[in-house]
Amino acid sequence: MANFPRSAKRNLNENDTNFSLAKEYEELLRKIEKTKTILHTSGNVEVGITPHEVVQETRAYKLTHYRPMLSKTARTPILIVYALINKSYILDLQVDKSWIHSLVSQGFDVYLINWKSPTQYDKYTSFDDYVNVYIDDCIEYIRSKKIIDQVTLHGYCMGATMSAMYCSLHQEKVKNLATIAPVIDSSRDTTVLANFSRHLDAERMFSTVGNMPKEQLYSCYSALKPFKQGVNKYLNLVENIDNDSFVQNFLRIEKWLYDTPDIAGETFRQWISDIYQHNLLYKNEMKIGDHLIDLSKITIPFLNIVAEEDHLVSPECSAALNDCVSSTDKRLLRFHTGHVGLIASSYSQNNVLPKVGQWFRTRS
């Protein structure tokens, strides 16, 4: 580590401003060196901390089960459908900020779909496969295992959109639908991501590269907030490098940000073309396979959770789902946080999850 020159130190009085600056300079260098060392070992950070077991596995997904932590449990199990972007352990990053740990500690029987990264053999995998095959298979497993007729379907982001699609076609198997930040009405989405998606040639990308590469996905999301993602977060890390709790949380988030799978080419094409560019889902004109998605057919109890400061999905884009469904028992919850803060923060634990848990409890 570089040090302030000793010859210069000898000429400084401890009361001098220059002496104070020298000490601050040395302290900054120490923190930078410590930061470099920690970042080089960041891959060892632990995630996915709540006890669980894989109960079903295919080439497309792993179905994970989290047992409730209370002797008295809710009757209806919850199936969480995560997005196809990034990895699902953001929902279980660390105990004090874990969405899943909070649910199981409240007595809920929770299942989670962990999507696998597609290979080039999977580039023709579409929403028809994800919704009518993979999600349906998971629900059938739970119904058979628990000897029940219905589950609570709980989706996040892209997974919330797919959950709504599923309920429009198969709601006889779903008791309640709860969505977090779904992409529904793209005409109301004013984010940079939505604007970028409107100008993307998804057809050409699919025909050229097949699956959407994870490297391009990461670059795209990082570019949405370039100063924050490229500079500011590392300055904050240096400033807080002696705070172990801050550092561990930073490393877990960083691991998740870089851990991005590819997206199946046909699914990505539909996502961009049908939903963002032509707004077919909101218009009830989107087809997956031979099935027309009509969101107005959803009549089951419905909870929609949106983030007012979401920079990935505008809150009004998500809130539109409340107008689409025909449920008489429906509720929209708005929270002053961001896309990730909604599910993986102290704010979420204190403000979001108590209300979500209460909603589940009274309908399970």
Write out the residue ranges for each language-model feature.
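Short alpha-helix in the alpha/beta-hydrolase fold that links the catalytic acid
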Residues: 288, 300, 314-323
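Short beta-strand/loop motif that positions the catalytic acidic residue
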Residues: 298, 304-306, 310
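Gly/Ala-rich beta-loop-alpha elbow adjacent to hydrolase catalytic centers
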Residues: 154-159, 163
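Short, surface-exposed "cap/lid" segments of acyl-processing enzymes
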Residues: 41, 48-119
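Alpha/beta-hydrolase-fold enzymes
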Residues: 1-21, 144, 148, 162-266
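Catalytic histidine-centered segment of alpha/beta-hydrolase-like enzymes
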Residues: 312-315, 332, 336-351
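Alpha/beta-hydrolase active-site loop
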Residues: 124-145
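N-terminal targeting or regulatory segments adjacent to alpha/beta-hydrolase or S9 domains
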Residues: 1-48
